[in-house]
């Protein structure tokens, strides 16, 4: 499937992530079958290894006719019954509610409960759902229908989700602001290449019954795709920052050109850095949208943060490019990376319906050394906010070959702030616009970059002089300055870039320094010169 089609479907499907229905007075039913079999992580790895040793079998996507006939409103009216959730009425700290098949979610996902080292299939039961206004005759559905995915709630607040797994290998979670936003997924394959991307699927889940006072829920998953099979373990701990510890073991079926570990997916339509028509192709749909939308900014994330193995911190503001583009940040033993929503000011969004200022940031922390590779950022052109057009992931330096076994562990932190932050000054805003000196004739085209830094030593009295150190891959830099910015107790750095005749993206970096000593994280950017360079 093409990426744009799938992500449109997932964005629409995740709109269904609303609070669960109020529990009824009916007693909870057991959703599990009687037959059990032994289960542990080693068994799951053996299962994935055996799966990868055979040919890939394409999943069934033919919905039963009653489900295939459902439209958007009808499908959206089907909700999980809280009183028939897994572990409902058992005084346990978590329960799980299942998504019904239908609409965009056509391939059944098998669910299992694990207790005492034994697993049992969770059978589809129409009693688990309220069919609302769908008009669906559930008696006409097959008994082994299966599910589309699941969502997790807690005993502390059973009306609100803390995490959900739905569609391909996608999942989402919330932190203390109880707001869904960007997604993560199990694996990315050939993302950002100029051909159809491969989307692995979580085909089965095993939910481990929690102890009565547990603060963490363990979930296992089996992943399958034409190129790879995998065994996954998720340890999910809700809180102001929800933490997921992920362990993945992959078994490669065939060579993979671009493998993405710990992939994150988000949306960036426009921000203060990316509003101006001349920032790219002024005829693009995205530019027309931002010229007419009343909201100042629309994005789930506004930047990629990287903590390199060397200790350097990088901040790369996101953009909505005129065409597909990617940027790689080579590293050896990365300490972490994430897609963040740094801007938390509601006045900058003016949207009291979706609350972009509350969208969670997600930080990836490798559990063990990942060696050589690169953090890769892929940006696609988006015409509206329903399309997740941003992807970031870790790409190992050596492409996997058929027969290889790979293991990766990492922690995902979902919340308003990442668990770590640079001790230096941070970028708080990036703006761009036409260059030159106001009031003087422009003799050539140039583009201005304005970067605001705050924190670190910048607000301290008697600090040393600040020098902006700028590096560009092409073109010429002129009109450089760095001056105090009192309203943020920081520094504003500015420069103009005069591009050469080429149209390929230009990479830029800027760091504030005092002599050889860095005072700020490294601001990194990628800019595509416009075709129209009239002055």
UniProtKB/Swiss-Prot annotation:
It is found in: Periplasm. Keywords: Periplasm, Signal. Predicted to be exported by the Tat system. The position of the signal peptide cleavage has not been experimentally proven. GO terms for molecular function: carbohydrate binding; catalytic activity. Pathway: Glycan metabolism; osmoregulated periplasmic glucan (OPG) biosynthesis. InterPro entries: Gal_mutarotase_sf_dom, GH-type_carb-bd, Glucan_biosyn_MdoD, Glucan_biosyn_MdoG/MdoD, Glucan_biosyn_MdoG_C, Ig-like_fold, Ig_E-set, TAT_signal. Belongs to the OpgD/OpgG family. This is Glucans biosynthesis protein D 1. It comes from Ralstonia nicotianae (strain ATCC BAA-1114 / GMI1000). The gene is opgD1.
């Amino acid at each position: 499937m093409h990426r744009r089609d799938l992500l449109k479907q997932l964005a629409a499907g995740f709109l269904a992530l609303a609070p669960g229905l109020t529990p009824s007075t009916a007693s909870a039913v057991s959703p599990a079958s009687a037959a059990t079999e032994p289960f542990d992580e080693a068994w799951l790895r053996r299962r994935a290894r055996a799966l990868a040793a055979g040919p890939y079998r394409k999943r069934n996507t033919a919905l039963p006719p009653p489900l295939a006939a459902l439209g958007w409103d009808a499908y959206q009216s089907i909700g999980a019954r809280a009183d028939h959730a897994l572990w409902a009425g058992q005084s346990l700290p978590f329960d799980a509610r299942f998504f019904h098949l239908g609409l965009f979610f056509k391939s059944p996902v098998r669910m299992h409960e694990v207790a005492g080292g034994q697993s049992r299939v969770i059978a589809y039961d129409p009693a688990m759902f309220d069919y609302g206004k769908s008009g669906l005759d559930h008696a006409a559905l097959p008994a082994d229908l299966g599910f589309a995915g699941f969502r997790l709630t807690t005993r502390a607040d059973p009306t609100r989700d803390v995490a959900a797994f739905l569609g391909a290998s996608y999942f989402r979670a919330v932190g203390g602001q109880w707001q869904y936003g960007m997604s993560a997924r199990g694996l990315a394959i050939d993302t950002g290449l100029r051909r159809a991307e491969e989307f692995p699927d979580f085909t089965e889940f095993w939910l481990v019954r929690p102890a009565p006072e547990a603060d963490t829920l363990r979930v296992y998953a089996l992943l399958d795709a034409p190129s790879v099979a995998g065994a996954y373990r998720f340890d999910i701990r809700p809180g102001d920052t929800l933490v997921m510890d992920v362990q993945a073991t992959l078994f490669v079926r065939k060579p993979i050109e671009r493998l993405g570990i710990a992939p994150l997916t988000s949306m960036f339509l426009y921000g203060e850095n990316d509003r101006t028509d001349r920032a790219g192709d002024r005829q693009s749909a995205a530019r027309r949208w931002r010229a007419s939308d009343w909201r100042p900014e629309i994005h789930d994330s506004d930047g990629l943060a990287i903590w390199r193995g060397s200790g350097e911190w990088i901040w790369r503001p996101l953009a909505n490019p005129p065409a597909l583009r990617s940027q790689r940040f080579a590293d050896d033993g990365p300490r972490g990376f994430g897609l963040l929503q740094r801007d938390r000011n509601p006045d900058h969004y003016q949207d009291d319906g979706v609350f972009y200022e509350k969208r969670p940031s997600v930080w990836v922390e490798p559990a063990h050394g990942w060696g050589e590779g690169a953090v890769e950022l892929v940006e696609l052109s988006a015409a509206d906010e329903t399309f997740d057009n941003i992807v970031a992931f870790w790409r190992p330096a050596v492409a996997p070959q058929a027969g290889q076994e790979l293991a990766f562990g990492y922690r995902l932190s979902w919340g308003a702030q990442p668990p770590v932050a640079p001790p230096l000054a941070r970028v708080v805003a990036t703006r761009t616009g036409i260059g030159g000196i106001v009031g003087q004739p422009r003799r050539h085209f140039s583009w201005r970059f304005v970067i605001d830094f705050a924190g670190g030593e910048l607000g301290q009295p008697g600090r040393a002089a600040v020098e902006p150190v700028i590096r560009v891959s092409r073109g010429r830099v002129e009109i450089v300055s760095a001056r105090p910015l009192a309203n943020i107790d920081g520094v504003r750095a500015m420069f103009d870039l005069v591009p050469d005749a080429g149209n390929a993206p230009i990479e830029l970096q800027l760091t504030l320094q005092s002599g050889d000593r860095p005072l700020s994280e490294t601001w990194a950017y990628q800019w595509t010169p416009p075709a129209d360079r009239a002055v």
